[in-house]
């Protein structure tokens, strides 16, 4: 059909004109079993295929009834390959008089961002340096060996054990960073190699599931700081962030003393996230989703760790060392990953364009050789969120271009000192707690 209406066109009808659709029609298809999305003005019915989406049905479903063009480009390297999967899902295209994006969006910003992405591709900033990532893996393995040699040569006393725990925690933190690079397919050109290497780093070196991490982390990138779409900020009723503070206050919900959440954060946030929450969530995901290969990889980590340290400590001592390492790395994980997000805007879906949504949810931390290494280059969070598949050693080169784009459109490009970024987490929690208390008492 050539007019505007519900499509009756079949993908196999080569040469036939595509049905034309309006945004009003597209918006009606954003239900759990009925989802359409728009990529490059073409409309796709992903209702059935979403369950087969490699990134998970939730990830692609978060873009239901939206223009997902920039997300499509951001998450995929080989677009010609991915388009083969889209073709059978094609049901129409936007009518000529329809805008490319639904709702009040800055068309000029969208065009400028896409021009920036093309310029970045022309500069070959999506090409990785194998030696850089080889050194990262090498220094992780070296720390694992060094920690064991320290106990082997000096014995399991308090001083060697403390030093070994610190070294292992640093190794675990750097493993988080490396598997994060691999999960974003930013090292190898072939996505399969990235995923295989990620399973090794995440499974054998850390004891976690690569599929579990990608499931939750890709959602964070698709919709950062959006409740019920970004798992990292969907933390109520334990902590109240952003708009949830007023909502809980008005509804007189008081499961915890939220006006003191900036204090109990130190007790249950940094110490326990990796040790308790991640361990339980990770195991549940592997069992429920039947990720048996990930389970074997994770089991190989625990087998290696226990076999390495039980001869020196016995079973209780080896488990205590494991807990110490997990608690130390958990502190690193919480502070480093949240310093860029918790102090920023957190709330419900605003349906912004890609660049605006990422910039509203992120900020940077002043770079230095140490901070770049220590944070896994997550101090360049703005650049990472705009270009998630970009190898991190290129963030410094693209940063001035992103900053210029923000200046042109009056967008915030915030860069903080490292310690200020850490303190702002506590300030933000305290502010949200006070907002909750005010709403609880007076609204």
From Swiss-Prot:
Keywords: Electron transport, Endoplasmic reticulum, Fatty acid biosynthesis, Fatty acid metabolism, Lipid biosynthesis, Lipid metabolism, Membrane, Oxidoreductase, Transmembrane, Transmembrane helix, Transport. Pathway: Lipid metabolism; polyunsaturated fatty acid biosynthesis; Lipid metabolism; sphingolipid metabolism. Residues 18-95 form the Cytochrome b5 heme-binding domain. Its EC number is 1.14.19.-. CDD domains: Delta6-FADS-like. Mammals have different sphingoid bases that differ in their length and/or pattern of desaturation and hydroxyl groups. The predominant sphingoid base that comprises mammalian ceramides is sphing-4-enine (sphingosine or SPH) which has a trans (E) desaturation at carbon 4. FADS3 is a desaturase that introduces a cis (Z) double bond between carbon 14 and carbon 15 of the sphingoid base (also known as long chain base, LCB), producing LCBs such as sphinga-4,14-dienine (SPD, d18:2(4E,14Z)) from SPH. Prefers SPH-containing ceramides (N-acylsphing-4-enines) as substrates. This is Fatty acid desaturase 3.
């Amino acid at each position: 059909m050539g007019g505007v209406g519900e499509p009756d066109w079949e993908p196999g009808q080569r040469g036939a004109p595509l049905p034309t659709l309006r945004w009003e029609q597209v918006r009606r298809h954003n239900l759990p079993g009925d989802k359409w999305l728009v990529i490059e003005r073409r409309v796709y019915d992903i209702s059935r295929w979403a369950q087969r989406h490699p990134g998970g049905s939730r990830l692609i479903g978060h873009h239901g009834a939206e223009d997902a063009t920039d997300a499509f480009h951001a998450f995929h390297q080989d677009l010609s390959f991915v388009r083969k999967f889209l073709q059978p899902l094609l049901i129409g295209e936007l009518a000529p008089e329809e805008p490319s994006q639904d709702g009040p969006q800055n068309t000029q910003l969208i065009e400028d961002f896409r021009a920036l992405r093309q310029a970045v591709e022309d500069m070959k900033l999506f090409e990785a340096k194998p030696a850089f990532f080889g050194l990262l893996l090498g220094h992780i393995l070296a720390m694992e060996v060094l920690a064991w040699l320290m106990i082997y040569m000096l014995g399991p006393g308090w001083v060697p054990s403390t030093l070994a725990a610190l070294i292992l925690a640093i190794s675990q933190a750097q493993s988080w960073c490396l598997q994060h690079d691999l999960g974003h397919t930013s090292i190898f050109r072939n996505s399969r190699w990235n995923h295989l290497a990620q399973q090794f780093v995440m499974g054998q070196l850390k004891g976690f599931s690569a599929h579990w991490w990608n499931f939750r982390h890709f959602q964070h990138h698709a919709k950062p700081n959006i409740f019920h779409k970004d798992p990292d900020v969907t933390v109520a009723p334990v902590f109240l962030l952003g708009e949830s503070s007023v909502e809980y206050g008005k509804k007189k919900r008081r499961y915890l003393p939220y006006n003191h959440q900036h204090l109990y954060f130190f007790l249950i946030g940094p110490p326990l996230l990796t040790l308790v929450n991640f361990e339980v969530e990770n195991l549940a995901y592997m069992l429920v989703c039947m990720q048996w290969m990930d389970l074997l990889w994770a089991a190989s980590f625990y087998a290696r760790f226990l076999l390495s340290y039980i001869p020196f400590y016995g079973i209780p001592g080896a488990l205590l060392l494991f807990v110490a390492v997990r608690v130390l790395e958990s502190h690193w994980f919480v502070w480093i990953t949240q310093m860029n997000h918790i102090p920023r805007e957190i709330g419900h879906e605003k349906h912004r364009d890609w660049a605006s949504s990422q910039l509203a949810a992120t900020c940077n931390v002043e770079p230095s050789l140490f901070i770049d290494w220590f944070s896994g280059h997550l101090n360049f969070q703005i650049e990472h969120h705009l270009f998630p598949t970009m190898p991190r050693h290129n963030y410094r080169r693209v940063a001035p271009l992103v900053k210029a784009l923000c200046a042109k459109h009056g967008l915030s490009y915030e860069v903080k000192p490292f310690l200020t970024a850490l303190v702002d987490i506590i300030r933000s929690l305290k502010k949200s707690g006070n907002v909750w208390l005010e709403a609880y008492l007076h609204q």
